[in-house]
Amino acid sequence: MIQWTTPTLRLTVRGADLTGTDVHATIKQGGRDPIEGEVTSVTYDAEAEATVVLADFTQVQTGGIRKGDATVQLNSVTAEGKRLATSEKRIEVGDNHIKEVLAYGS
């Protein structure tokens, strides 16, 4: 069995006050079903910038994510289901870790 390290990825959402919203992370990869990532912490600064740390891609260990390109999309959603902000990052997934961030989205 492959032993995976725990990848950490930071995404930042700007321009919206995310206080009180639920933040969800979705990992998408080449025509496969999207996978929910675990959002472990959300911090806010004085300018309502939120930094979310994804400390665990829960399905990497079961083969849900494969080597190669993937996109992580971050969505903040109000209790009423309204989406406030979205941020995306393209990543390169290696044998047992995230190799690098390829590009920043909006």
Can you say where each PLM-predicted feature lies in the sequence?
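Contiguous segments within soluble domain cores/interaction surfaces
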Residues: 1-106
